[in-house]
A protein has these predicted regions:
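Catalytic histidine-centered segment of alpha/beta-hydrolase-like enzymes
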Residues: 251-264
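C-terminal alpha-helix
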Residues: 266-273
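Catalytic histidine neighborhood in serine/cysteine hydrolases
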Residues: 239-253
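Flexible "cap/lid" subdomain of the alpha/beta-hydrolase fold that forms the substrate-access gate
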Residues: 1-33, 37-243
Length: 273
């Protein structure tokens, strides 16, 4: 029930599908909230159909726009993606943690965040049987070191599906993928995050122009302790001058899971005011 080819997946296709869904259902007077891809795709959808939305809120996401990435950064990313380096979940996670607080617009080529995010992109694409359960439980739950180490060992041996002590979260995130052929989406989509200039550049510019002139309520709700997106919040507030920033609530990247009550209360107050 999932497209099986890499070419089936792109940022633009996801935006088109969601915009078509929005129009087909004729939804109006909406309050939007997006996180992660929900923001990258959803904010573009909002920009396509702004009259359907009364309020916008988002967090741990953004509309990356980096038209002038340093040439040295582009060359390093290209070389890295084509390399034979084999990444593990642990080695990838270490590099991603060092993205913290950095902005795509910075000129420091040694510490440019795209040079860290490329580890996530390469890991996902090169790993045919992406360990979705292991990745998600590590980001969303507090597991014992013994359990995490044992799960990692099973995955390393190609036996991840046989690990007997999976949490319900791990099982839930593995359930949509009966075998590796179903995992093309999570493998392919990270490479479409526009941390460097790509085919989405002009569409990103146009969407950001909508939010530059946005005159309706816009709430930025970031966790504040997510190394992947901490550096994006400043860009969001700059992109939308009308945006207000909510207090950081913690909880890491998937804070809608780890801080559901705190996030819900912020959004309920935003909707009701």
């Amino acid at each position: 029930d999932k497209p099986a080819e890499r070419e089936d997946y792109s940022y633009q296709k996801q935006v088109d599908w969601m915009t078509d869904w929005l129009i087909a259902n004729n939804f109006k007077n909406l309050t939007f909230f997006g996180q992660d891809w929900g923001g990258l795709i959803g904010l573009r959808m909002v920009a396509n159909e702004p009259s359907r939305f009364d309020k916008v809120s988002m967090g741990n996401t953004g509309l990356p726009y980096n038209p002038e990435a340093p040439k040295e950064v582009l060359e390093k990313i290209k070389e890295f993606r084509e390399s034979s380096l084999k990444l593990t979940p642990m080695s990838m996670a270490k590099e991603i943690s060092e993205m913290d607080g950095k902005s795509l617009s910075q000129e420091d080529t040694e510490f440019h965040p795209a040079l860290k995010f490329m580890y996530w992109q390469k890991f996902c694409w090169d790993t045919v049987d992406l360990p979705t359960g292991l990745l998600m439980t590590n980001m969303m739950e507090k597991n014992s070191r013994l359990n995490s180490a044992a799960y990692y060992l099973f995955v390393s041996l190609g036996l991840g599906k046989y690990f007997p002590f999976k949490s319900d979260v791990a099982k839930a995130y593995e359930a949509p993928f009966p075998d590796p052929s179903y995992k093309m989406g999570p493998r392919a989509m990270p490479s479409h995050v526009p941390t460097i200039p790509d085919q989405s550049l002009e569409a990103q510019r146009k969407a950001r122009e909508v939010f530059k002139n946005w005159d309706k309520p816009f709430l930025s709700v970031f966790a504040g302790d997510d190394p992947v997106t901490n550096g994006i919040e400043r860009d969001v507030l700059s992109m939308c001058p009308n945006a207000k920033s909510a207090p950081h609530i913690g909880g890491g990247h998937f804070y809608q899971w780890t801080r559901p009550k705190e996030l819900s209360n912020l959004l309920i107050n935003f909707i009701n005011t």
